[in-house]
Amino acid sequence: MTNNSQAVPAIALAGVNLSLGHGAARVHILKDIDLHIGTGEAIGLVGPSGSGKSTLLMVMAGLERADTGSVAVAGRNLSNLDEDALARFRGRHIGIVFQSFHLIPTMTALENVAVPLELAGEMDAHARAREELAAVGLSERLD
């Protein structure tokens, strides 16, 4: 077994704070969050409704900026990126699957799988989509 303790974490948050609102209505959503998620590691994020889970995920994806602290993905500090660079970085390195996602009903299974690959710049998205559908036993459902 190798020691990966020195490896760059897939996601690293250090001292992350986020408040929303103004003045007396200001609410502290995230308070001094430190979190390291290693490559290939899976975690569960649980808590009651309104506890900041979705907000934390938005900060981790660079869709919401923390007030203080740092957020790094694949060793890249997101706070150092302007909006255009952040959008490009997200397109290459960050994916989000929302709780209620749906396939596009007017598209085939092949097209539904190929579209995000095309958006990510995959050269032969349809061939890759066929491979991925075959890998999960859905070759017969391409059309």
Regions found by a protein language model. Name each.
Residues 24-27, 78-95, 119:
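ABC ATPase NBD coupling module
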